[in-house]
C-alpha cells in the first residue's frame, strides 16, 4: 500500500489539477483539512521550493485569496513561443493609460474611456483583451448595451499585485510634481509576494 502523500504534495497536486482557475483559500482549507496558518506555511514552503529548484518551471502565486500554479518568469520566452505571441513585450503608453483608467474606474465602457482620453481606444482595448489583462464583464444597461471592461487576475499577476486594493492611491500623487508610472514593471517585479493573509 502506497503511503499517503504529504500535505504539501497534496496542495501541489490540487493546484495542478485546478489549472488556471486555481483554488480559493476556503476550498483548500476544506480539502486539506488544515488551519489557515498551516495553509500559509505549506504555501510559503512550496513557493520557496519551486523558486529554488532550477529544474522547475513553475511558481506558486496567490491572487485575491486564490492560489495558483503558474509558469515561472524564467520560462517566459519558451511559453511565448508556444502561444506564438510575445507576452514579455512592453505595453504602449496608450495601452498603459487605458489600463490605468480601467483599473480605477471598472467596470467601464469603451465610450466612457474614449471620453476620458479624448481619442478612440478600440485598437488598444483589443490588444489588452488579447494579452489577457482585461476582459468583457457584462453589458451596461443603456441604449446599445455596450460591453463593460474590467481587469483580470492576470492583470494582478502581470504587475505583481495581490488585489486591486494594492493599487497606488491616486490622491497620494496629486501634490507630486514628478510623473508616476502606476505600472512600473521593474519596480513591481522586485516586490516580494508573501502569503500572510488574514485568518
From Swiss-Prot:
Q: Which UniProt keywords apply?
A: Cell cycle, Cell division, Chromosome partition, Cytoplasm
Q: Name the domain of life.
A: Bacteria
Q: Which GO terms describe its biological process?
A: cell division; chromosome separation; DNA replication
Q: Which Gene3D superfamilies match?
A: Winged helix-like DNA-binding domain superfamily/Winged helix DNA-binding domain
Q: Which GO terms describe its cellular component?
A: cytoplasm
A Pfam family recorded for this sequence: SMC_ScpB
Transmembrane parts of this sequence: none
Is Cytoplasm tagged as a keyword?
yes
Known PANTHER family for this protein? SEGREGATION AND CONDENSATION PROTEIN B (PTHR34298:SF2)
Instruction: Summarize the protein's role.
Output: Participates in chromosomal partition during cell division. May act via the formation of a condensin-like complex containing Smc and ScpA that pull DNA away from mid-cell into both cell halves.
Please give the family membership noted in the entry. Belongs to the ScpB family.
What do we know about how this protein assembles, alone or with others? Answer: Homodimer. Homodimerization may be required to stabilize the binding of ScpA to the Smc head domains. Component of a cohesin-like complex composed of ScpA, ScpB and the Smc homodimer, in which ScpA and ScpB bind to the head domain of Smc. The presence of the three proteins is required for the association of the complex with DNA.
Protein name, as recorded: Segregation and condensation protein B
Organism, scientific name: Lactobacillus gasseri (strain ATCC 33323 / DSM 20243 / BCRC 14619 / CIP 102991 / JCM 1131 / KCTC 3163 / NCIMB 11718 / NCTC 13722 / AM63)
